[in-house]
Amino acid sequence: MKRICTLLSVFVVLCTHRSSAVEAKPNILFIAIDDLKPLLGCYGASWIKSPNIDRLAERGTVFTASYCQVPLCAPSRISMLSGLSPDANGVYFNPFKVKNVLRRHLPEVVTLPQHFKNNGYITRAMGKVFDGRTVDAGHDSVSWSRPFVNQHRFAPCGPGVRGYQNPETKDRLNEAAKESPAKPLAGPPAESCDVPDGAYLDGAMARTAVAEIKELAQQPQPFFLAVGFHKPHLPFIAPKKYWDLYDRAALPLAAFQAFPFGSPPEAQVVPNSGELRDYAGVIKSGSISEAQQRELINGYAACVSYIDAQVDLLVKALEESGIAENTIVCIWGDNGWHLGEHGHWGKSTDYEDGTRVPLIIRAPNVGKGVRSSSLTELLDVYPTLCDLAGLSKPAHLQGKSLAPIMRNPTTQIHEAAISQCSTVDSQMSPQLVGGQLDELATIHSQMGWTLRTPRYRYVEWREAKLTDKEHVFGTKVLGVELYDYQTDPLERENLAGKTEYATVLKEQKALFEKMLPHLPKRVE
């Protein structure tokens, strides 16, 4: 009898353990990488050294045709984390004067991390998850169950100036700041210093994230940890050992460094590499020299490899804590970046290099070793993580779950991926302050919406008037663009005026009206 009771006790314990294991919610490690284009080995860039992200990709799903909603930091992140498109959330620019624009525009919206918090998760963030200009001092305090970690403004081996560690650069910028605090001196666009990884912000933050993972692994609740790396955003600064991974003379330059033939003037307003040209030693107009192009590409690649090493620290922390098999890892870039393509060095374009982003999801028991060319958007991440974690999806979400694609990579969920990019007519809009917008005033702009189908890209430009409280789009079409990636993968020529593409153009316009029904009827 005693033996029977013992066996029954063991059986009950085993069943209880199995039940709790089945019911356990997966953790989420949410890794945002600022300005990362799909320049990774797992995306076919064989010359890039990204072994750790590539290894993670082999165990997860790589979405090779993923697109951001806006090719600009702040609006892209608000769109993804709110689950609402820019036309639904009203955020199109990096804000300048208006603070906490997320809750100003969307006071009641439940963000992605907030939804997980509301469902019993410990939610924590460090680094650049939201763009800091769009949220409160707590990085949207209601989204996190623990305070936002923002102590990495200065790296451990010294404060640096805006992240620089070169002593001469630091001294020069410090002196200039003393003389003219309101107008700080520009630093160089790139830096290679022989310092440890933790000397720069992202390396310091990664080490804090490792400690956070190990502490969270001991908690009874599941966690949602968001880590936002700042590189490869300008300036391209990384420890020298990552620069040395590359032979600068052998680095590939952009194959086509001009605007597409026949592209409308609206498409050529923003791409003047304005962000880059604000740095010291960069000419204010005209073509970037080949020598500087190679330095910049070397710097961008070094930053990618640097971040790759930091991602590895986080993944190893999951493994060492024994929670890797019950943790979903999501790696994404907020927008694309031109490394000389179309003669542009920066973001904020409706072209492929401006809108296409990396998206990799490794999840337990689904999507291992999957690659999919199905069209996806960053809007899809919110519902996807809900599905993978077994949570209900908020009714306001505009994206679609990618879980079906992870199970069957040929599954199609979108007819087209939608992105949009606005340009500002500086003559119509004098409310430009330091290259940024005074969004308290009316901004006269042009908005370009783009549809990316498996073969084509259609862009439609219209006049827009944007304020902090409303956005009005005109009916008049200012310009259209059409690109065929089967015959012209580099977007060399706008085909919208070609007779042989008249039928395709008509089909794309019809699809545009179908997918963007909130816009006023066009007048051509």
Model-derived features with residue positions:
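Sec-dependent N-terminal signal peptides
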Residues: I4-V13
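Bacterial Sec-dependent signal peptides at the C-terminal "C-region" and cleavage site
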Residues: V12-A24
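Formylglycine-dependent sulfatase
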Residues: K2-I4, A21-E481, P489-A510, K514-P520, ...
